[in-house]
Amino acid sequence: MFKQELKIDGRLVGHQHPNYIIAEMSANHGQSLSRAKELVYAAKEAGADAIKLQTYSADTLTMKCDLPHFFIKDGPWKGQYLYDLYQHAYMPWEFHAELFELAKKIGITCFSSPFDKSAVDLLEQLDAPAYKIASPELIDHQLIRDVAATGKPVIMSTGGATLPEIADAVKVAKDAGVTELCLLKCTSTYPAPADSINLRTIPHMREAFSVPVGLSDHTLGNDVPLASVAVGGCVIEKHFVMDKNDQTADSFFSMTPEELQNLVHGVRQIEKAMGQVHYPDTSCQKRRCVYLIKDVESGETLSNMHLRQMRPGGGEIQPKHLPSLIGRRVNKSLPAGTQLKWEDFC
């Protein structure tokens, strides 16, 4: 049985809690430790809950080979061999310790997506508080088991996965002892067009698997992640770069610190606006109630000439009752402007 909330570095994550906002560093460090540290500081300043890394090397993902199926033929990275792309994009593993230490020092959670057992081992040495299974690794059941063995909360992205593949991964995690699991709806297109996102999958996935569900977003701008809050998402992950002009593998679809700050602000405003099921009381001055518009004497019979429905409201006789007052007698003398009450009638 999965819990309905995760606890990551002391922060509760789930549908009864504020959205957990993850700034995904990905390849935007540009293999520069100083730039990576800038991103950690900027994510904290923007209000993100976590900065997330990716822990792999070209050799742990693929092999150096010039056969045709190792060559990227389309998409944003076309014209490169896989090995060369990953060799350019990976974060040097020696960066991890300093980034984890910095994040802890300034008060932002740092965790990572491992891509093999050696990455899990490194992250365990750094006491990573949670793990993220990237979309392409959802079908790597051994990696899920390796992560599950740590006993930490697990977030799994589902880009490109069929419903049966997601169900298989969830079962593997459950059987391996994971009790804190979150799924992320994801579209593995870079950048992803809005009409490919299908946000209605979020509540469906939540119902299907009885776990918290959020969004790993690759669209441009904030519209889609903000909308995910309204359909019940509880986690938002977005790629994050210091400057869109940075020549990194992911910069062209990543958000800047200013955009991240705007996202965080927007999410928190929407969370306030979502509120709860609520209907207002009726004591509103902008509504109308029934008034006397002429002086009347005690015992006088009312006609249309005496009555009007108008503002301010708040009186006990609503406009719908006005017709029933015609022909009734008042039991006291009343001046024009009186907000009528039922006790005023014989």
What is the role of each PLM region?
Residues 1-346:
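Catalytic cores and adjacent flexible loops of soluble metabolic enzymes
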